[in-house]
């Protein structure tokens, strides 16, 4: 099923009503002064529903509670109905900028303390902004709920006076770094921005990017930001959603205590949906630092939850949703294009129907040729019509996506919050399923004729620099010059915080209650006679089954000169079998709502299987067919190989890829470990179909395989379903590989050139420890935690929060059974490359010489040992836990052993590990950026600078 089905579940896109599928209790179940009961929905008489209770505070704050006692954790989401679409002309990027500022402290929460307190509590947190909303969310152990509510309330009601010019300037630089990393320094990064400028009329809320224009942010001042907060961040424009192991009465009392005194903000209406049309195709183009050209066609359609959204989604699936789609058949399978797809993303005010394709250089087809194939495919669709299987696949995907979306508390809370924000009805999930199930063939043809056939689009060509002649057609449209709007200055005396007195001391951090015990998943063991070891766990929260089959046949089993063989085999196993074509296999899986993905890691060929349990046996038959009966079709191999080569060439345009590639090569030198599992242009060119068949026959055998299962079925029923694998026999060749220490020169900078790069990619590190679960590797990872392993680590706080050089910086130990490494990394502003290296080196040296502080040790212990509540919640999390046990031959007791290590490790032990493993003179540095600018700066630091080519 195409990704949009998961997206619509994640954002709870819904329309037609089906009130028979819910039970609404009209009476108040809890009475607390200042809180008004709205409704309660239970899970009776409905196939898919998220039970909840809904309330409203006197100040307008909407509160939604969802109880789920299966794990001792809570997820808290506060969504403000403001995104970039609420911004004024000339003040783009404010919503996203403000998201950053909301982590900079408030009256009673010090700068950077929000991250510290949540991390210390064993939780995770983040925020996000899109065109229509901004949300902040935390998942924490259940005993930490009050602390999170205190934190969120403090930045809602007590933020303004804590904002300083210094914080403002640092976060402005951080946003610029984020734009550099995600937009300006990324291939095709400006595509969506340019298309939106051409598609929407000037002043339309979607005509500017969410991240904003830098000149708008440069013009902004502190008062502008404060005014934005006062306009949009009132409780009456917010939804607070809390889910997990909660007591509703106690939770509501806490909500009233912390949020009740906050004054309502200005009234907020639902945004208008401005209508617009384009009266002719608009051709636009740009040159970019890319290898492959790209064509992108965007048609305006409807808006979120419009009655035609669902049939348009079905249409997008038919035209470009995977191997059964028309674009795949006409462009990808024919090797005219490396990639081609269709999507129909929807937002609150508008949706777009988008086609894109990247021509394959070997086809010698122009973007104009590709555009014609797309238009011919539309004609083919009109002649073909809508088939019954098209609707069956969509409905199966909706059902499975909905059920899989209920596996985590965070997923359920996110759906409730989004549904409330955009429809004033948290219970939209059932209605969403209903409207997709109601789509008919006639609906799909109707929306095709209304929104696509003979309609006009923005047609964007992105071509490599110097190849402007390759665009699909000459530009015939120029967006109007951007207006800065009235840009009226906001007077400082026009902004005043409205603070009401509390009957408690808000400055005191709430203390946590007793940490609830976390049960390690109970598990069962088994094996098949063919040598596959099985480890399973029963999870009855959803009627689903997830499996991971690991066969010792990964990247390290390939020869160095043919690196990429294992990954190409994995791709071939996802193609045709002797019984079905690739399209028929994809069709069969989509009709079941199941997925089978195969990929090669370093040590294992991994087969991931997800299915509704009712379809498990049918899904396993297809998985078995993929593994045992690959067709190895020559044309499919050539297509996959050629596409992989083009991908390897295109990757060289990405600074992060170049840095990681150079770093890997330097740490491993003449060894298969020095080459990515996907191979490179040279090694991929060496691989033949015969090599793939040979690798398959020598290595893809069941002996020593590992199968991990998480299902609502018990051991007996699961074992019965797995019985078909008994007929698979054989032993693969043993891995014979060592990864010796390289003789790479250390203490120097290896410089990889990327002309005119807006950012530089930095990697600093060395070969280090092999992975172990409770030994020195684990203890070294603990040692690194306060240095570079958390958001509020020394490295990130320095380079991001204090200096504004980067969007994020980190350090970590990584390893497997053969080798390991220590790495510090970041993408930084090009003009701060040398200064960033100075700060990296200073932080690493200082930590190695002076060690950890008492406060950092306390933080480490609390953060690591309270994470257990979050470790085993979802089937995916359980799969990872069981896979770790099976691969390393552990018992569940290793969890307690790790906890004991965290609780008892001393400062002296940590400091000794830092001294041993963080000697900066034993490390090498890789810098990717504009060499002509960077070389003199780096040499001025006193390092030898060595040019390095990839």
Model-derived features: positions:
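Short, conserved secondary-structure transition motifs
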Residues: 175-182, 274-288, 394-405, 611-612, ...
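Sec-dependent signal peptide recognition
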Residues: 2-9
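M16 family metallopeptidases and their MPP-like homologs
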Residues: 66, 71-87, 93-97, 112-158, ...
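Proteolytic maturation boundary segments
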Residues: 17-63, 247-287, 329, 430-550, ...
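C-terminal motif of bacterial Sec signal peptides marking the signal peptidase cleavage site
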Residues: 12-15
């Amino acid at each position: 099923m195409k990704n949009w089905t998961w997206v619509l579940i994640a954002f709870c896109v819904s329309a037609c009503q089906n009130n028979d599928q819910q039970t609404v209790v009209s009476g108040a179940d809890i009475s607390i002064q200042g809180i008004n009961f709205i409704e309660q929905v239970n899970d009776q008489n409905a196939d898919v529903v998220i039970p909840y209770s809904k309330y409203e505070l006197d100040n307008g704050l909407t509160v939604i509670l969802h109880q789920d006692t299966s794990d001792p954790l809570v997820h808290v989401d506060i969504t403000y109905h403001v995104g970039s679409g609420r911004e004024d002309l000339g003040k783009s990027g404010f919503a996203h900028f403000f998201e950053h500022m909301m982590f900079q402290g408030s009256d009673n929460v010090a700068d950077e303390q929000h991250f510290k307190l949540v991390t210390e509590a064993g939780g995770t947190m983040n925020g996000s902004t899109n065109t229509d909303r901004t949300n902040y969310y935390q998942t924490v152990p259940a005993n930490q709920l009050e602390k999170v509510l205190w934190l969120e309330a403090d930045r809602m009601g007590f933020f303004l006076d804590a904002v300083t010019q210094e914080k403002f300037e640092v976060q402005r630089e951080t946003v610029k770094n984020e734009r550099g990393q995600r937009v300006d320094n990324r291939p095709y990064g400006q595509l969506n921005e340019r298309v939106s400028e051409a598609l929407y009329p000037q002043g339309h809320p979607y005509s500017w990017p969410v991240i904003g224009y830098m000149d708008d942010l440069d013009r902004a001042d502190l008062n502008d930001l404060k005014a934005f907060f006062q306009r949009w961040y009132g409780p009456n424009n917010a939804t607070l959603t809390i889910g997990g192991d909660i007591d509703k009465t106690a939770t509501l009392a806490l909500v009233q205590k912390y949020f009740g005194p906050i004054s309502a903000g200005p009234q907020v209406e639902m945004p208008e949906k401005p209508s617009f049309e384009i009266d002719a195709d608009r051709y636009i183009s740009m040159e970019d630092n890319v290898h492959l050209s790209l064509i992108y066609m965007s048609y305006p359609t409807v808006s979120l939850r419009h009655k035609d959204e669902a049939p348009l989604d079905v249409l997008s699936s038919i035209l470009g949703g995977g191997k059964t789609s028309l674009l795949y058949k006409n462009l990808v399978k024919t090797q005219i294009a490396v990639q081609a797809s269709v999507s129909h993303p929807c937002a609150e005010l508008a949706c777009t129907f988008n086609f894109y394709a990247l021509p394959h250089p070997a086809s010698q087809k122009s973007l104009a040729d590709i555009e014609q194939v797309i238009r011919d495919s539309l004609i083919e669709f009109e002649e073909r019509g809508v088939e019954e299987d098209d609707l069956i696949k969509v409905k199966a995907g909706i059902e499975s996506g909905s059920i899989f979306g209920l596996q985590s508390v965070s997923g359920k809370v996110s759906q409730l919050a989004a549904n409330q924000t955009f429809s004033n009805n948290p219970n939209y999930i059932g209605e969403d399923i209903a409207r997709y199930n109601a789509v008919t063939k006639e609906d799909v043809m109707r929306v095709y004729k209304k929104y696509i056939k003979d309609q006009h689009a923005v047609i964007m060509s992105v071509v490599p620099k110097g190849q402007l002649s390759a665009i699909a057609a000459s530009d015939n449209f120029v967006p109007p010059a951007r207006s800065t709007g009235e840009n009226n200055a906001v007077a400082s005396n026009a902004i005043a915080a409205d603070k009401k007195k509390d009957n408690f001391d808000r400055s005191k951090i709430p203390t946590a209650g007793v940490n609830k015990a976390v049960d390690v998943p109970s598990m069962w063991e088994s094996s098949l006679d063919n040598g596959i070891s099985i480890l399973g766990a029963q999870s009855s929260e959803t009627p689903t089954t997830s499996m991971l089959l690991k066969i010792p046949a990964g990247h390290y089993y390939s020869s160095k000169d043919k690196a990429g063989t294992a990954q190409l085999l994995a791709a071939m196993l996802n193609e045709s079998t002797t019984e079905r074509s690739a399209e028929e296999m994809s069709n069969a899986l989509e009709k079941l709502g199941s997925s089978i993905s195969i990929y090669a890691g370093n040590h294992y060929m991994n087969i991931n299987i997800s299915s509704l349990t009712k379809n498990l046996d049918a899904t396993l038959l297809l998985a078995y067919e993929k593994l045992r009966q690959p067709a190895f079709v020559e044309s499919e191999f050539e297509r996959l190989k050629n596409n992989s080569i083009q991908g390897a060439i295109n990757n060289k345009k990405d600074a992060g890829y170049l840095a990681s590639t150079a770093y890997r090569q330097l740490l491993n030198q003449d060894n298969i470990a020095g080459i990515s599992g996907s191979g490179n242009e040279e090694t991929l060119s060496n691989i033949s179909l015969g090599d793939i068949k040979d690798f398959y026959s020598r290595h893809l055998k069941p002996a020593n395989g590992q199968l991990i299962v998480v299902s609502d079925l018990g051991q007996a029923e699961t074992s019965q379903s797995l019985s078909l694998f008994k007929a698979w026999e054989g032993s693969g060749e043993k891995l014979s590989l060592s990864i010796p220490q390289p003789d790479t020169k250390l203490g120097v900078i290896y410089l990889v050139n990327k002309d005119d790069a807006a950012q530089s990619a930095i990697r600093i590190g060395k070969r280090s420890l092999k992975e172990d679960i409770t030994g020195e590797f684990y203890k070294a990872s603990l040692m690194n935690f306060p240095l570079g392993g958390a958001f509020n680590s020394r490295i990130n706080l320095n380079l991001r929060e204090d200096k504004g050089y980067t969007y994020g910086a980190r350090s970590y130990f990584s390893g497997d059974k053969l080798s390991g490494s220590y790495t510090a990394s970041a993408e930084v502003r090009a003009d701060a490359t040398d200064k960033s290296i100075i700060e990296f080196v200073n932080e690493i040296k200082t930590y190695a010489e002076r060690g950890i502080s008492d406060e950092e040790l306390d933080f480490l212990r609390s953060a690591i040992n309270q994470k257990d509540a979050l470790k085993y919640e979802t089937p995916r999390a359980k799969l990872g836990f069981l896979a770790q046990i099976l691969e390393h031959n552990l018992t569940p007791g290793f969890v307690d052993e790790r906890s004991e290590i965290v609780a008892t490790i001393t400062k002296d032990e940590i400091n000794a590990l830092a001294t041993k493993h963080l000697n900066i003179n034993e490390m090498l540095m890789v810098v990717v950026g504009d060499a002509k600018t960077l070389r003199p700066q780096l040499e001025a630091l006193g390092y030898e600078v060595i040019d390095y080519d990839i």
